[in-house]
């Protein structure tokens, strides 16, 4: 079974978010960790705290094109950067875009019209977009309906940033499940182990994982870790899905653990 981590971060400089490790994480360490945990591939999500993180990710792809792909970013509030999207997928390993809106300046963008130009252009160019959308899940449904050929994936099952404990983490779950009716919306089940307060195998998470699987199915639910903020091992993040969930097995397990996300972002298997 091919195992593909749907979200990792690499960075060489800058001040990481408080819930991530505070030292750089480079491709050499990531590859060693992946090999130790049995991870075949990983999709790099360049970080905004390192302004050169897109190029760092491209360097990783050039060195290891069979191991890494990228969901990159650019400054959405700088009009001069908008032209970059037209040739975005011409960059090595660049499979899509990923954005999050954590600072006060950007939190209103999904609703105030700032991003209205982005959705039709990404749809036209067939560029998948991944969003940290916990604060605007209903808005994602509106975008998906208006742009039915735009592929949208929701980071971390819609869990708000820096949340701890399953009850708090899954308070948006009804809003997330409501998006399953849109065939162009998928869910990244990334970083889930980091929300558990109970020990491995994190039984507090299992019901929500099952409900998301039942709603979205194996082709629109993607396993991953966001490994640099996990309090458990990469291997435990794997076996949470491959061993601890009795309802996830066979071809469905293979899809969730990597094949489905590769298909979603058109990363050749």
Q: What residue spans do the PLM features occupy?
A:
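Active-site neighborhood of phospho(di)ester-bond hydrolases with catalytic His/Asp-centered motifs
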Residues: 3-6, 44-46, 71-72, 98, ...
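Active-site environment of divalent metal-dependent phosphoester hydrolases
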Residues: 11-14, 49-52, 77-80, 102-105, ...
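Short, acidic/polar
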Residues: 22-33, 54, 78-89, 171-172
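Conserved, mostly hydrophobic/aromatic
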Residues: 7, 34, 57, 88, ...
